[in-house]
Amino acid sequence: MYDLFKQLIAVFILSLCFNLHARTADDATTIIRNDTLKDKAAKKAQRDAERLELRNSNDRFKISFDYLRAKLETELSFELPTGNLNSVISLENDLGLPSNSYFFTGSFLYRITPRSGLYAQYYGINRKETSQTQRDLIFKGEIIPAGTDVEAHFNTQVISTGYLYSVLKDRNAYLGFYLNIYFMFVETGIQSAYGLQDLDVELLAPLPNFGILASFKLNKWLYFNGNIGFFALKLDDFGGSIHNYDLTLMAKPVNWLGIDLSYQVFDVMVEFPSDGINTEIDYNFRGPSIGLSFFF
């Protein structure tokens, strides 16, 4: 009888301890849940406040126009699938296209949140020149003898659009990455009195790109902006690569206007078939630019 009484007391004590532990655990869970909800609510309120501040600021939209002086280098390569024909032509050295060009670029930035945004950029370069060939050239399988008067052209239209995201949460600093896609239209060709008319190569290439960008406020009115990007792709009969970077100093005398001084580099190589001939375009430009940015 005494042993039974001890067992009942032990069971009662264990039950009491279990209930006390369960109640303590429930109370702790409730406290943690309440703290989590409060933390989520505080973070949401902070995000809403940051977005409202961005909406009321002059930094949500940015439109930029730049005037660029660029040094250009352009090469065309043609190769038959059998490998019997392999020709490389420099459009500047062999066909007389100007190696320096002045052109405008335009860009637009929309900041969705203080840390993310969408942007788009456009530029176009059209070049045409009449010259006399200094050596025999092979353009798409046709031989152009030395001493032939030719008119060559190379036209480029580029649209870039993408998404950017910053890992920093600082009004005076932006450090993150971007992912974009280039839609590049290229048209090049030769006309000559030799009888070769409109030997054209046309290409519309969507090329993705990935990169890193940074922006820092140096003092009250001076900012530094920079980005660098690279991508390469190779499929069965199509391939390409893009390398670009941009360094900019921007003076901002008022909150809605920026004066930009930049140095830009853009290098693209594209391989594709054209009329049964493996064609490669290697095109790049680099040079300084000056421009204006408008914020609103």
Predicted features by range, described:
Residues R60, S101-T105, T156-S160, A205-N209, ...:
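Transmembrane beta-barrel architecture of outer-membrane proteins
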Residues Y67, Y110-I112, Y165-V167, I181, ...:
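Residue-level signature of outer-membrane beta-barrel architecture
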Residues E73-S101, G124-Q157, M184-L203, L233-D236, ...:
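Extracellular/periplasm-exposed beta-strand and loop segments of Gram-negative cell-envelope proteins
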Residues R115-L118, D170-A173, K220-F224, N255-I259:
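Repeated loop/turn-to-beta-strand initiation elements of outer-membrane beta-barrel proteins
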Residues A251, Y283-F296:
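Outer-membrane beta-barrel "beta-signal"
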Residues F65-R69, A120-G124, F177-F183, A214, ...:
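Transmembrane beta-barrel strands of outer-membrane/channel proteins
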Residues R23-Y122, F295:
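Short glycine/proline- and aromatic-enriched beta-strand/turn motifs that initiate or cap beta-hairpins
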Residues L80, F183-V254, F266-M269, F296:
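Outer-membrane beta-barrel transmembrane domain signature
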